């Protein structure tokens, strides 16, 4: 499969041109571990999970519309009204919050699988918020953007913050951390997972003891949803069993994606070349700093450098 790793592409993508769209990365994520500690009276589950970004994902091509305040989003997604799209909703939220009179043209280059548990929709929403905050010069803080993002989805603030994080509660308590940046083979089985079905299953563990982050990082990582998911979805079980032949492997989130971890890229690529054709998949490196935030840091640095150049007389 064609590589869409951000690290090589970003080097050529940090020059701003008037009227021309900029390409902003919208990275995937993995839940390196996921434990369910209990259930709140409101029905939400209490979790402990570790998020890490991947050097792989979608792209959003964004340009400012100065002639009006319209949000023009392409392409259309079948069976999804534009006003219900998370990208569109994120842009409108930011417009209203910061009283922005400008608009935007946004094109989604969709690469990540739908319903894979790698955060595609949440990442798209966060990239829209963070990128438009920069382009429109809305000047909202990361915390303000994260609060907006939380109204769109529980995982959106993680992508807005842009750093690998340990999340607790229902995901609202976030602690930045630095897990090892390993290489991963990620497979997407041909199953569409119902998160509601998984969390309503009576066999789902709901009493895993809470532990400190230090203790969790020192132990083998697990996902409490994994056994229930493979009991419901045979293709997930097949993909997981295939990966387990080569390396430690597990489910991310509630799936359907599964992943195996490797210390070196060559090992991951060698396994990926043997992948059964039935599975969509890719190889990516784990990143503790989001490629989106790395790009914005480069853009800000370039802009500051240009402003500080002496005039030539």
From Swiss-Prot:
Record key words, sorted: ATP-binding, Isoprene biosynthesis, Kinase, Nucleotide-binding, Transferase
Record EC number: 2.7.1.148
Gene3D superfamilies named among the record's database cross-references: 3.30.230.10, GHMP kinase, C-terminal domain
Reactions the enzyme catalyzes: 4-CDP-2-C-methyl-D-erythritol + ATP = 4-CDP-2-C-methyl-D-erythritol 2-phosphate + ADP + H(+)
GO molecular function, one term: ATP binding
Recorded family membership: Belongs to the GHMP kinase family. IspE subfamily.
Name of the protein: 4-diphosphocytidyl-2-C-methyl-D-erythritol kinase
Annotated organism of origin: Haemophilus influenzae (strain ATCC 51907 / DSM 11121 / KW20 / Rd)
Gene: ispE
């Amino acid at each position: 499969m064609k590589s869409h790793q951000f690290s090589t592409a970003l080097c050529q993508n940090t020059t701003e041109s008037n009227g021309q769209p900029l390409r902003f990365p919208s990275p995937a994520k993995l839940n390196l571990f996921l434990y369910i500690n209990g259930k709140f009276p409101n029905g939400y589950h209490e979790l402990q999970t570790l998020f890490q970004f991947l050097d792989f994902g979608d792209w959003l091509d964004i340009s400012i519309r100065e002639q009006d305040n319209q949000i023009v989003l392409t392409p259309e997604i079948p069976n999804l009204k534009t006003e219900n799209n998370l990208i569109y909703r994120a842009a409108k939220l930011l417009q209203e919050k910061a009283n922005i009179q400008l608009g935007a043209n946004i094109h989604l280059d969709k690469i990540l699988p739908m319903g894979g548990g790698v955060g595609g929709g949440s990442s798209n929403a966060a990239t829209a918020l963070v990128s438009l905050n920069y382009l429109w010069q809305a000047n909202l803080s990361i915390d303000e953007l994260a609060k907006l993002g939380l109204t769109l989805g529980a995982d959106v603030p993680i992508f807005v913050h842009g750093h690998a994080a340990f999340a607790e509660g229902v995901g609202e308590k976030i602690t930045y951390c630095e897990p090892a940046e390993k290489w991963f083979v990620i497979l997407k089985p041909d199953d569409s997972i119902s998160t509601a079905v998984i969390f309503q299953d009576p066999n789902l563990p709901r009493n895993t003891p809470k532990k400190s982050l230090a203790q969790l990082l020192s132990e083998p990582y697990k996902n409490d949803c994994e056994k229930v998911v493979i009991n419901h979805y045979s293709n997930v079980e097949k993909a997981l069993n295939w990966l387990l032949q080569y390396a430690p492997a597990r489910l991310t989130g509630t799936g359907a994606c599964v992943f195996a971890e490797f210390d070196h890229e060559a090992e991951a690529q060698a396994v990926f070349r043997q992948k059964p054709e039935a599975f969509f998949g890719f190889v990516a490196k784990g990143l503790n700093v989001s490629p989106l935030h790395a790009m914005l840091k480069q853009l800000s640095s370039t802009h500051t450098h240009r402003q500080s150049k002496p005039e030539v007389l």
